[in-house]
C-alpha cells in the first residue's frame, strides 16, 4: 500500500504523534464525538473516585484513529493518577510485564495498546494481576525453581485494540468496562478541526472546516492530517486562510473525494467492478489482484467502505453495492438471476 496514503487512520511517524498530542483533548468535557462513551465513563470515574477505588479495568476497541489512546490519557487525568504506556508487541517475555507492574503506584493506569497482540505467556501473568492484584513469578530454573507471589497495588489496566475478536475469552472477561468507539459525524469532526485550528493559530472559516471534516472518513486523526496538508496549500497558494474553496482545491489535489475516498479505495472498488463483475470475490483473490496484503485490506481499507455502504461482505466474498455504482456514475450490469435491476 502507498506509504504516503494521506487518509490512512494509522499514525505514520513520531512527528505526527507529537503534533496530535499537542491538540489532544485533556478532559471528558473536551472529548467530543463519542457522547455515549463520555457519559458512561464520567459516571464510572466519578463513582470510583467517590469510593476512593481504582477504576475497573477498561477495554477500548474500534477502528484506528478514533481516540483510544486519547481516552486512556483522559481516564488517567480524570482519576488524578499517572499513566504508564506500553503495547502488546513490546511485552515479549513475562519479565517485561513484571517490570512494569512492580513499578506501578496505587491507582495508576497501565495502558496497553494493541493488547490483542500479547503473547500467551504474558497473558498468563496478567490474569492474576488483573483479578487479584498479585504477580506470580518463577525464581530459578529446573528442580530449584519456585513460584513466589508479589502483592501489587490496585491499578487500572486500559487495553486498546482494533480487533477485539482476537482477544482470548479469559482476557476479555476480566475487563469490567468495555467501550466501543464509533466513527464520528461530520459536525463533530468540524468541531474538532475548528478546535485544532484555535490551538495551532490557523485561520479557518466554518465552511473550510466543514469541507475538511466531510472528507475525513469519520476519523479525527485523518481530519487533523488533512488539516495540516490544507494549511500547507493555503500558505503557498493563498493568503494562509482556509476557506471552503481553498480546502476543496487542496483536497482535490490530494485526490480525496467528497466521500473521503482516495486512490486506494477507488482502485479496490474499480477492481471489483470491472475485473470481477461487481463481485462477490474472495479476499485473497482481491488482495492478489491488487498486489496488497489481505490483512491490510481487511483491517485498514475495508472498514470505512463497509461502514459507508460501498461494499458488503457475503459468504462468497466481497461485492460492491448499488451505492458504489451510483457514486462513480455507472450502471450496474445486469446479472443472470436478477429479478430487479435498479
Curated annotation (Swiss-Prot):
Region (Head domain (RuvB-H)): 258-342
Keywords, comma-separated and alphabetical: ATP-binding, Cytoplasm, DNA damage, DNA recombination, DNA repair, DNA-binding, Hydrolase, Nucleotide-binding
Keyword set includes Cytoplasm: yes
Reaction equation(s) it catalyzes: ATP + H2O = ADP + phosphate + H(+)
Gene3D superfamilies (alphabetical): 1.10.8.60, P-loop containing nucleotide triphosphate hydrolases, Winged helix-like DNA-binding domain superfamily/Winged helix DNA-binding domain
Annotated spans, Small ATPAse domain (RuvB-S): 185-255
E.C. number: 3.6.4.-
Annotated residues for binding of DNA: 313, 318
NCBIfam families the UniProt entry points to: PRK00080.1 (NF000868), ruvB (TIGR00635)
Function in brief: The RuvA-RuvB-RuvC complex processes Holliday junction (HJ) DNA during genetic recombination and DNA repair, while the RuvA-RuvB complex plays an important role in the rescue of blocked DNA replication forks via replication fork reversal (RFR). RuvA specifically binds to HJ cruciform DNA, conferring on it an open structure. The RuvB hexamer acts as an ATP-dependent pump, pulling dsDNA into and through the RuvAB complex. RuvB forms 2 homohexamers on either side of HJ DNA bound by 1 or 2 RuvA tetramers; 4 subunits per hexamer contact DNA at a time.
Protein name: Holliday junction branch migration complex subunit RuvB
Gene name for this UniProt entry: ruvB
